[in-house]
Amino acid sequence: MSVIKMTDLDLAGKRVFIRADLNVPVKDGKVTSDARIIASLPTIKHCLEAGAKVMVTSHLGRPTEGEYAEEFSLQPVVNYLNDALDCEVKLAKDYLNGLELNAGELVVLENVRFNKGEKKNEEELSKQYASLCDIFVMDAFGTAHRAQASTHGVGMHADVACAGPLLANELEALGKAMDKPARPMVAIVGGSKVSTKLTVLESLSKIADQLVVGGGIANTFIAAAGHNVGKSLYEADLVETAKKLMDECAIPVATDVACAKAFDENAEAEIKHVSEVQDDDMIFDLGPDSTAELAEILKNAKTILWNGPVGVFEFKNFEAGTKGISEAIAASEGFSVAGGGDTLAAIDKFGIKADVSYISTGGGAFLEFVEGKVLPAVEMLEARAK
């Protein structure tokens, strides 16, 4: 995909408007998880060092649009940036009618959702944002699937609209995994329901050489293979859909599973062959044989796309499947991309962050990209590159 990259532009003396993803958790006025800010720092530093007049903004939380609310202010982010960049960073509350900035200066523009018309991508607001800058930088992949004034509209009216390093890297990594993957390509889709991941499964079934399913999703496929799943979470109305997918793509179905009688952290895991699952059993994880089989598939993969754990990994007795998959991905020499909240939690839990080629920053945007949907912000950047 062809977009203008911020790193290819001369930014000296230019007014640069960066739409970042600084939507971080805040408690008692302090940022409690700084991952998104840290991810945005290289983009901000690059602009400052290039001698640009830098404005950065984001949404934070879900305020009532058009109304200021202190609990959703970006002030805690400004305080964090002051320390992280070791320079004075100001917060601008009223900025829509223009700002005066010096080269090498950074101003944070208050929460975009305090501006009426932001979510509806209103043209008037988009033009006001665009009038503030010479160059618009879209660097928030996490909101690229939303057509809003600060992610889409502004880019249609700014003199130049480009992709920031974070967004460019994300598009490159996902493109490498999805568009022309090195083969064999293995996709892992976990989660509780087939219904919430159906489009993802359908999209990946056309690309992947092997499609691995886990979690509650796997139970529907076990049922589709003709086995009893007891009281396990599964979707009877999607069994036929699962069968159709199994006809279209190689989907290895578990041969053994870890069961219990109740959804309880302290429940003992009982390993059973899938043909031995009883009516009162609940399947919470893959068994050791199935995990080993999947690990072998991953060992030979040249491309791996991972979205979702394969069991209730939060419970010690049912973490083995996800742990085994994690370790196999970490050991693989193939190119691996992982995304989704639960997936990131599993990566942290099993300490494999350094061994995954690319970890996506976008939840909903990651899924929509994998579904094959066009992301409005990316479509805008492509249009502006022509």
Swiss-Prot record:
<comment type="subunit">
    <text>Monomer.</text>
</comment>
<dbReference type="InterPro" id="IPR001576">
    <property type="entry name" value="Phosphoglycerate_kinase"/>
</dbReference>
<dbReference type="Pfam" id="PF00162">
    <property type="entry name" value="PGK"/>
</dbReference>
<feature type="binding site">
    <location>
        <begin position="340"/>
        <end position="343"/>
    </location>
    <ligand>
        <name>ATP</name>
    </ligand>
</feature>
<dbReference type="InterPro" id="IPR015824">
    <property type="entry name" value="Phosphoglycerate_kinase_N"/>
</dbReference>
<keyword id="KW-0547">Nucleotide-binding</keyword>
<keyword id="KW-0963">Cytoplasm</keyword>
<keyword id="KW-0808">Transferase</keyword>
<dbReference type="GO" id="GO:0006094">
    <property type="term" value="P:gluconeogenesis"/>
</dbReference>
<feature type="binding site">
    <location>
        <begin position="59"/>
        <end position="62"/>
    </location>
    <ligand>
        <name>substrate</name>
    </ligand>
</feature>
<dbReference type="GO" id="GO:0005829">
    <property type="term" value="C:cytosol"/>
</dbReference>
<feature type="binding site">
    <location>
        <position position="113"/>
    </location>
    <ligand>
        <name>substrate</name>
    </ligand>
</feature>
<keyword id="KW-0418">Kinase</keyword>
<dbReference type="InterPro" id="IPR015911">
    <property type="entry name" value="Phosphoglycerate_kinase_CS"/>
</dbReference>
<feature type="binding site">
    <location>
        <begin position="21"/>
        <end position="23"/>
    </location>
    <ligand>
        <name>substrate</name>
    </ligand>
</feature>
<comment type="pathway">
    <text>Carbohydrate degradation; glycolysis; pyruvate from D-glyceraldehyde 3-phosphate: step 2/5.</text>
</comment>
<dbReference type="GO" id="GO:0006096">
    <property type="term" value="P:glycolytic process"/>
</dbReference>
<dbReference type="GO" id="GO:0005524">
    <property type="term" value="F:ATP binding"/>
</dbReference>
<keyword id="KW-0067">ATP-binding</keyword>
<feature type="binding site">
    <location>
        <position position="314"/>
    </location>
    <ligand>
        <name>ATP</name>
    </ligand>
</feature>
<dbReference type="GO" id="GO:0043531">
    <property type="term" value="F:ADP binding"/>
</dbReference>
<feature type="binding site">
    <location>
        <position position="146"/>
    </location>
    <ligand>
        <name>substrate</name>
    </ligand>
</feature>
<dbReference type="GO" id="GO:0004618">
    <property type="term" value="F:phosphoglycerate kinase activity"/>
</dbReference>
<keyword id="KW-0324">Glycolysis</keyword>
<comment type="similarity">
    <text>Belongs to the phosphoglycerate kinase family.</text>
</comment>
<feature type="binding site">
    <location>
        <position position="36"/>
    </location>
    <ligand>
        <name>substrate</name>
    </ligand>
</feature>
<protein>
    <recommendedName>
        <fullName>Phosphoglycerate kinase</fullName>
        <ecNumber>2.7.2.3</ecNumber>
    </recommendedName>
</protein>
<dbReference type="InterPro" id="IPR036043">
    <property type="entry name" value="Phosphoglycerate_kinase_sf"/>
</dbReference>
<feature type="binding site">
    <location>
        <position position="197"/>
    </location>
    <ligand>
        <name>ATP</name>
    </ligand>
</feature>
